[in-house]
């Protein structure tokens, strides 16, 4: 049975500080590295091998992938990076503490910014140095395609062309693929694969560095999906993600 494993990056510095990260290129914490290495060990122990891996342009995802492949002795497999797998762009919220923002604007407003389907935060200005137009890694991406902010819908609209043109077609000639990305970019893929409604997708909270496996039948329809790990531990990790946008 063919498989695609989705993996959110390990804890980043701004995950630890409970900040809106988006396209800001922050590194993994020591805990994040350990989480990524644990994911690699878990995948190896469950007998997984990957034919190809995909990740974003952001170092927290790239380094997570490197840790996983190292622990699996799969450093040699082909890896494809795409800006389309980047996290949702949080606009002018990037860098702000989520709990402090909830104190200022209310938990409901922060939940809307974090989890609503089609409402985006305020955009970055054209002169803001956080604007991706100033980042050389995106010099081959047209200015019209680079976001200044995004809703989850915008994020999915960015990701799905790449999913449809590159990742999913590769499954025809491969047995197992690995996608290491971000909470919201992976949420978009999961929404597509499981046909989750716009209303229900905002309730999905992905923990860091816990492998999420999708199995496909001979017609490449989803046959099964599951997390690898202790169900109770995973439930607690999901609750922790859900609580990030609440007041202190």
Curated annotation (Swiss-Prot):
Instruction: Cite the active-site annotation.
Output: 9 (tele-phosphohistidine intermediate), 87 (proton donor/acceptor)
- Does the record's keyword annotation contain Isomerase? yes
Name the InterPro entries for this protein. His_Pase_superF_clade-1, His_PPase_superfam, PG/BPGM_mutase_AS, Phosphogly_mut1
Ligand binding (substrate) = 8-15, 21-22, 60, 87-90, 98, 114-115, 183-184
Pathway participation: Carbohydrate degradation; glycolysis; pyruvate from D-glyceraldehyde 3-phosphate: step 3/5
Xref: PROSITE patterns: PG_MUTASE (PS00175)
In this chain, the site described as Transition state stabilizer is at 182
Q: What does this protein do?
A: Catalyzes the interconversion of 2-phosphoglycerate and 3-phosphoglycerate.
Please name the HAMAP family in this protein's record. Answer: PGAM_GpmA (MF_01039)
Identification of the protein by name: 2,3-bisphosphoglycerate-dependent phosphoglycerate mutase 2
Q: State the species of origin.
A: Bacteroides thetaiotaomicron (strain ATCC 29148 / DSM 2079 / JCM 5827 / CCUG 10774 / NCTC 10582 / VPI-5482 / E50)
Taxonomy of the source species: Bacteria, Pseudomonadati, Bacteroidota, Bacteroidia, Bacteroidales
């Amino acid at each position: 049975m063919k498989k695609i494993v989705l993996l959110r990056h390990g804890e980043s510095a701004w995950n630890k500080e409970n900040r809106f990260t988006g396209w800001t290129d922050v590194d993994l914490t020591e805990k994040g590295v350990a989480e990524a290495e644990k994911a690699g060990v878990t995948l190896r122990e469950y007998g997984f091998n990957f034919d190809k891996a995909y990740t974003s342009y952001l170092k927290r995802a790239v380094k997570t992938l490197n840790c996983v492949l190292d622990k699996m002795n799969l450093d040699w497999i082909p890896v494809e990076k795409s800006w389309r797998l980047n996290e949702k762009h949080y606009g002018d919220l990037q860098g702000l503490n989520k709990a402090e923002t909830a104190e200022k604007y209310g938990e409901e407003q922060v939940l809307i910014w974090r989890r609503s389907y089609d409402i985006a935060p305020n955009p970055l200005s054209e002169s803001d140095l956080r604007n991706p137009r100033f980042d050389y890694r995106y010099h081959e991406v047209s200015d019209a395609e680079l976001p200044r902010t995004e809703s989850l819908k915008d994020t999915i609209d960015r990701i799905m062309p790449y999913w449809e043109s590159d990742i999913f077609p590769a499954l025809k000639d491969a047995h197992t693929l690995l996608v290491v990305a971000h909470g919201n970019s992976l949420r978009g893929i999961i929404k597509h694969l499981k046909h989750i409604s716009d209303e229900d997708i905002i309730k999905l909270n992905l923990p860091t560095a816990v492998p999420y496996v999708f199995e496909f039948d001979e017609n490449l329809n989803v046959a099964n999906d599951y997390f690898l790990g202790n169900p109770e531990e995973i439930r607690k990790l999901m609750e922790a993600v859900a609580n990030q946008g609440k007041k202190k």
